Amino acid sequence: MSIEVLLNEFKEIAANPAKQLNDCKAAGKKAIGVLPYFAPEELVYAAGMMPFGIWGSNTKTINRSKEYCATFYCTIAQLALEMLLDGTMDQLDGIITPTICDTLRPMSQ
């Protein structure tokens, strides 16, 4: 498999988080959303579930999350909240929010 094929596959995965989540759920797996950076993914695997990284999306626009986020919040947090608000991540069975920064700390509320 060539590097171009692999890169195109990664681009497709990154551009379609909802499709990846749907594929996971269609396979009968439970999915737990994990926000960056230090969520204990090993615990999710140990519980027989799939950790699903919520890092935002290159295809999303920040709209609804602006109502909840201060202007200094990073794009990763704003896009993650956007995907949670617009239904992209509705199939998640739960979310782990590490509180490593001032932006993610209030996201757990």
Language-model features: locations:
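An N-terminal assembly and electron-transfer interface module characteristic of large anaerobic redox
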Residues: 1-109
